[in-house]
Structure formats: C-alpha cells, structure tokens
Curated annotation (Swiss-Prot):
It comes from Yarrowia lipolytica (strain CLIB 122 / E 150) (Yeast). Residues 1-101 are annotated as: Disordered. Its main location: nucleus. S-adenosyl-L-methionine binds at residues 297-300, 320-329, 346, 382-383. This is Histone-lysine N-methyltransferase, H3 lysine-79 specific.
Length: 492
C-alpha cells in the first residue's frame, strides 16, 4: 500500500539488471532459503552459452519432464500492496515465501548498522511510534471487518520488537477496500523479515519453513483464512517466544553484526510502515496545491531512488540533500538505506509537517529492528536565500532536485546556487539544467551551466508517482575543467 493513497500506480519499476548493479561490497546476510533465484541477465548477455557435446548427450538421455507453470511473484515492495486473498493457496504461499526470502539484487554500501543500546531498557523507552492499531481508518466499519464472527473475542494483540522489550499494538482485522492498511499482511512481513535476516537457521525454519511445511507463518495464515482469531493469537505468541529466546541467547545481535548494510527488502518495509501510519491517513491534504506551480506534489518511488543512490555512488560518509523534499521520503530512504547524513528542504507546510513526523517514526521503527540510520535534517522553508540549506549544499555529494514542475525563475535560481557546489557533486533532476547542444562561448562565459557535465538516463515504469510510464532523468556532475580550459585559451 506504499503511497497508494495518492491514487497513483504503485508497482515497482521494471529495471535492467545492468542499470541497478552497484560495484561495491555486497551485503552479507544469512539466507535460510532453498529456492535458488538467479539474477536477470544483462541485455548484452541474454543468450546462454552453447552446451558441450557431453552435456547435450546427457540432456538427450533424460526423459523430458514438463515444467510446472508458476506465476510471477511480487517482491516485498509489491507484496505490501497486494491482498491476502490474492496469495491464499498453499502453492502461492510457497511462491511468496520464495520471493520474500530473496534479498534485493542490489549490492549495498557496507557499514555498521547496529543501533546503540541494543537490548537495553533505555532503548525501549526511547521508542515512540504510531501503533498499528491506530493507523489509517481502522475504526471505520465500512472499510474494515473483523477476522472472526465471534464478537465476544478481542481483536487486539501485541507484537514485540526484535531489539528490546518494546511492544506494538495491532488489531487483527481485514480491509474490505483494496489499498487500505493490512495489519495481518504487515505481521506476516515482520515474521518474514525476522526469519530471513535476524535469527539462526533453526529458529528461522520454525518461523518460516523453506518450503512452507508446518511453521508459525503457515499456522498464522491458516488461522486467518479460517477466521480463527485465537489461533492467530497463539501463532503470534509462539513467534514472540522465538524472538525473545533468540535475543536472550545473543543470536539476533550476532546476526545483525554480520550484516554490512540494511537489506533492501527490510529498508522498503520500514519505509512502508512509516508512510502507512503518517502520510497515508493525511494524503488528501497533499492535494491542496496550485496546479502547474512550483509546489506541485509528486513522489519518487523507493526502487528508483535506490538506483539513483547507486548511479551517484552515495556512501555512508556522503551528504545527501533533497531540495523540495515533500513528505521526506527520499531524505529518509537515503539515511536508512545508505546510512549517510541526509537533508531535506520543503516549503509546503502540510508536507513538511508530515516529513517531521515520518522522521520521528523512522528513527523509532529502525530501533525496533536494532538498526541505526544516518542523521536526518529537515528544513521547513524555502531553499531560496536560506543560510542553513546553503551550508548543507556546499558540502553535498548528491543533490536531488525534483524540478519536473519548476518554472524558469526557480530553475535559474537553482543554477546560481550550483556555483557553490563542490567539485564532483552530482545533481539528480528530472529536467536537464544544461540546454541541448550547449557549447561554452564568450557570449555565455558566465553561465552556471558551464560547470555542469550532464548525463541523460532512463527510468522505468513505476519510478514516479504521477505517471505509470517510464521517462528520463539527468545526473549533472560539477566539473569546472571545461570552463577552465576555455579560459586558459583566452576565452576562444
């Protein structure tokens, strides 16, 4: 249900593997998975290597077995929006398990991700969240219905955090309307994340068996499908006991320390948790803007931003700045996924207010999983003539400007700001700041665009909130060598 309340297409992008592969250390993670999943081949390597004569003879000798048709399963980002009823068979349950058990194919930046005070009482008291039982429209009977027809049973349950003795309240109810927050789906995802990344193999298989034989997730799902509220509660208690035991034995902390980055499926899940509680219930307020103005609201989706981080080589030591940051999605994602110092500036009051709430929610939810983020700084004002923003962009390694709807005046002001960017800073935008065919000459020698070296790239379906279609974006690198060379030759 990520961002679905804005009425936009929510599917993840169909990206080429060659466009999203980062050339740095791959995140280390234990994978209690028996199903192998191969990376998609790059466009230049789609043909398989020719079989040897021996291999061909062996293949010919084996009887042909028809392959079982399997529908394509969604990743964690897509699954968070799908209805439980769409994946309620045992076969599809195994497929969903397989897809969720495979970490994203991106290679993530290595860093220490463990939060301070793991397992302590102080960590638990520092967590302040919007409980799942308070999210969205859960109290509206025209949108939600009980799991069980027995009205004497309470649908309230508590689910413990992985890192400390903090619990979150949930209501075990189901939505009647597609796209609404699904508490049961979220609980299943938490179980999945736990089994994949945080516990030892035995505990992992107890929570989610690799081929979905009898396990906690399977029993929980079956109880849900059968309207057995008490059965669901029993499964949740079993899950909590596994988590408490693993934390007490030091297994969760040990497994966290093995991770060299926040797994991408977990990062998207946390962002979705935060968004569904803070932004989704208030999404109507984001439509209150003047059409075709500089304040038109639109969102860049998480998979697209992951690609941007990789293309710009954003590192934990980097500084990321988003000018026109809206509700803070990109700013929060950079701090969580990469772990860098992350800045956002937004002039719209309603959007900047939600951004601040999302920041607080993300800090706490990351702590619940034992994860630390990079520092997040949000400025609720215009970035024009703003000293705090100016100081941040002068240190920026990556500057994001969603200038899709900016007018010429604001784009011109941005260009003037770019003069203070450091050499090598990368500017990501949806419109190029450098005119097509631009050549340095004595007539434009003072133009700020002379310090930019621009690269045009494609984004894929589902990358932005305002259209389902793909499009283009630009990465401009601050490179003063061309203008220096021009001036060294006397300006000719």
């Amino acid at each position: 249900m990520f961002f679905s309340h804005l009425g936009k297409k929510n599917g993840g992008p169909t990206a080429k593997s060659s466009d999203v592969k980062r050339k740095v250390t791959k995140v280390k993670t234990r994978k209690p998975v028996v199903t192998s999943v191969s990376k998609s081949p790059s466009p230049s390597k789609t043909a398989p290597p020719p079989a040897t004569a021996a291999a061909a003879a062996t293949a010919a000798a084996k009887p042909s077995t028809p392959r079982k048709s399997r529908r394509k399963t969604p990743n964690i980002y897509q699954l968070s929006k799908s209805s439980l009823s769409e994946v309620d068979t045992e076969e599809s349950e195994r497929e969903v398990s397989s897809s969720l058990s495979t970490p994203g194919l991106y290679e993530l930046v290595p860093r220490d991700i463990v939060t301070a005070g793991f397992g302590s009482a102080e960590l638990a008291t520092s967590i302040h969240i919007t409980n799942a039982s308070e999210s969205g429209n859960l109290s509206m009977t025209d949108i939600y219905e009980p799991v069980s027809t027995d009205k004497s049973l309470s649908d309230r349950v508590k689910l413990g955090a992985l890192s400390c003795d903090f619990v979150e309240d949930y209501s075990l109810i189901k939505p009647k309307v597609p796209g609404e927050f699904e508490p049961v789906r979220e609980i299943l995802s938490i179980m999945e994340m736990t089994a994949l990344h945080f516990v030892d193999k035995g505990a992992s298989e107890e929570i989610k068996h690799p081929v979905m034989d009898d396990c906690i997730m399977r029993r929980f799902r079956r109880s849900y499908e059968g309207g057995d509220l008490e059965g669901m509660k029993t499964s949740m208690k079993e899950f909590d006991e596994v988590v408490k035991t693993q934390r007490a034995e030091g297994a969760i902390l040990a497994n966290l320390k093995q991770l060299t980055a926040v797994p991408q499926d977990l990062a998207y899940f946390l962002l979705n948790q935060v968004y569904s509680r803070i932004v989704s219930p208030e999404s109507k307020s984001l439509r209150d803007y003047k059409a075709f103005s500089n304040n038109v609201y639109g969102e860049l989706m998480p998979p697209f931003m992951s690609t941007v981080f990789q293309k710009t080589d954003l590192q934990p030591s980097s500084v990321f700045v988003d000018l026109g940051s809206g509700v803070g999605n990109c700013t929060l994602q950079a701090a969580l996924e990469v772990g860098c110092e992350s800045w956002g500036c937004e002039v719209m009051t309603n959007a900047s207010s939600l951004a601040e709430k999302q920041k607080i929610e993300l800090y706490s939810r990351a702590k619940m999983f034992g994860i630390k983020t990079g520092d997040i700084h949000l400025v609720a004002s215009s970035f024009v003539h703003n000293d705090e923003v100016h100081s941040a962009i002068s240190r920026a390694d990556v500057l994001l400007v969603n200038n899709y709807a900016f007018d010429g005046t604001l784009n011109a002001h941005l260009l003037d700001m770019f003069l203070d960017l450091k050499e090598g800073c990368k500017i990501v935008s949806l419109k190029s700041f450098v005119p097509v065919g631009h050549v340095i000459s004595e007539h434009n020698i003072e133009s700020p665009v002379n310090i930019l070296k621009v690269q045009k790239l494609d984004f894929y379906s589902g990358s932005v909130s305002w259209t389902a279609a793909g499009g283009t974006y630009y990465i401009s690198t601050v490179d003063r060598s061309a203008i220096k060379a021009f001036l060294s030759k006397g300006g000719y």
